[in-house]
């Protein structure tokens, strides 16, 4: 799989850009602030329908414009698939696949598979649980696009339940138990589906991350991944879905008084974490700076290998990564990604350690092939 053409209209700093991309290595060179990361952000948006840099779509639209438009041409399994996304903040995206309009995100998500590693990814190891939850969910929807709807349904159920709890907390009124039971059941069903998907993913992903860490670190240190939930483990391990739902409902009842007082949901996937261990200790507190970089790289490379094992090799993106790594890790990283069908790299300078391939110069949101 590779992206053969990318077009941007009014996306971030770009009024208009159109570029042809090769399979293999494509390197975008330019000083900071010239628009390199905006290019790869557009590629990620075509894959996941969300930015890896911002939680909302408004910053994606060029200042003074009403909408941003992305077009990508993907070559996969010997056929070309055209993807079109129109981003209008505050409204649903307009999506087209091969010229046909669709309202369903899952019809587009997963066609272009992308794994990106960026300096912000140090937060996967050092940061809050939200970054690790987003990491898991992004891999989930690329691996199994139908789970885009599962995640969206959970987020909707969480918003609705929180709105109900907030209204009770603010008004100080007697809670309507029948209404609470309805919201609890809706939430528990959505939570059970997402929890099951995440736990299965961690089980599949862990061996790939362990192998990637060994390659990046030169065999120094052993890593372990574990999904930590606010729902009791014995509930999550049950094979029967209805039993898991009942267990989540029981967990909600235990914290009901606190939830009603605070006006928010205290149990569920939105409060879970991916526990990262290095040599049997929490990586967040014990890993050195270099070890943390190796761990973050291993998480991305593990996701890449898992997706590749599923039959389609993702596009690998390295966004200003080489500047963050020492020479040894640069060499090891280059070795790990050398087999990628397409590799997109951004860099402020054309580093000697960068792989050989097509070079582009990016300056003031203009892109041209280097001489």
From Swiss-Prot:
Record carries keyword Protein biosynthesis: no
Provide one Gene Ontology biological process annotation.
double-strand break repair
What Pfam families does the entry give?
SMC_N (PF02463)
InterPro entries xrefs: DNA-binding_RecF, DNA-binding_RecF_CS, P-loop_NTPase, RecF/RecN/SMC_N, RecF_2
The record's annotation in SUPFAM superfamilies points to: P-loop containing nucleoside triphosphate hydrolases
Localization per Swiss-Prot or TrEMBL: Cytoplasm
An example of a Gene Ontology cellular component annotation for this protein is:
cytoplasm
Principal place of residence: cytoplasm
Protein function: The RecF protein is involved in DNA metabolism; it is required for DNA replication and normal SOS inducibility. RecF binds preferentially to single-stranded, linear DNA. It also seems to bind ATP.
Family designation:
Belongs to the RecF family.
| NCBIfam families membership | recf
Any idea what this protein is called? DNA replication and repair protein RecF
Source organism (scientific name):
Acidothermus cellulolyticus (strain ATCC 43068 / DSM 8971 / 11B)
């Amino acid at each position: 799989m590779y992206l053969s053409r990318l077009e941007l209209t009014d996306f971030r700093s770009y009024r208009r850009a159109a570029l042809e991309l090769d399979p293999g290595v494509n390197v975008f060179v330019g000083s900071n602030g010239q628009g390199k990361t905006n290019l790869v952000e557009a590629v990620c948006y075509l894959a996941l329908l969300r930015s890896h840099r911002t939680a909302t779509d408004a910053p994606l639209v060029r200042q003074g414009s009403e909408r941003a438009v992305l077009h990508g041409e993907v070559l996969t399994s010997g056929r070309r698939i055209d993807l079109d996304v129109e981003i209008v903040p505050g409204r649903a995206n307009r999506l087209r696949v091969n010229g046909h309009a669709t309202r369903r995100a899952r019809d587009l998500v997963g066609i272009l598979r992308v794994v990106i590693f960026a300096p912000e990814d140090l937060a996967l190891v050092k940061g809050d649980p939200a970054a690790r939850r987003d990491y898991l969910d992004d891999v989930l929807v690329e691996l199994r696009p139908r789970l885009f709807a599962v995640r969206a349904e959970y987020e909707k159920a969480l918003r609705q339940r929180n709105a109900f709890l907030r209204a009770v907390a603010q008004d100080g009124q007697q809670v309507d138990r029948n209404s609470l039971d309805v919201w609890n059941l809706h939430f528990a069903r959505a939570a059970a589906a997402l929890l099951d998907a995440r736990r299965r993913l961690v089980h599949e992903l862990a061996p790939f991350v362990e192998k990637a860490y060994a390659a990046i670190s030169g065999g120094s240190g052993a890593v372990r991944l574990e999904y930590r939930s606010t729902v009791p483990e014995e509930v999550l391990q049950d094979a029967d879905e209805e039993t898991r739902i009942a267990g989540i409902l029981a967990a909600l009842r235990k914290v009901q008084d606190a939830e009603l007082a605070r006006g928010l949901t205290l149990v569920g996937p939105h409060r879970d974490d991916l526990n990262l261990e290095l040599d049997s200790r929490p990586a967040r507190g014990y890993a050195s700076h270099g070890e943390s970089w190796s761990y973050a790289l291993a998480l991305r490379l593990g996701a890449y290998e898992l997706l590749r094992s599923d039959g389609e090799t993702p596009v690998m993106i390295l966004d200003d990564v080489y500047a963050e790594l020492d020479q040894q890790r640069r060499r090891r990283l280059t070795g790990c990604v050398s087999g990628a069908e397409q590799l997109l790299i951004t860099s402020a300078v054309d580093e000697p350690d960068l792989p050989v391939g097509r070079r582009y110069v990016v300056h003031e949101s203009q892109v041209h092939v280097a001489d």
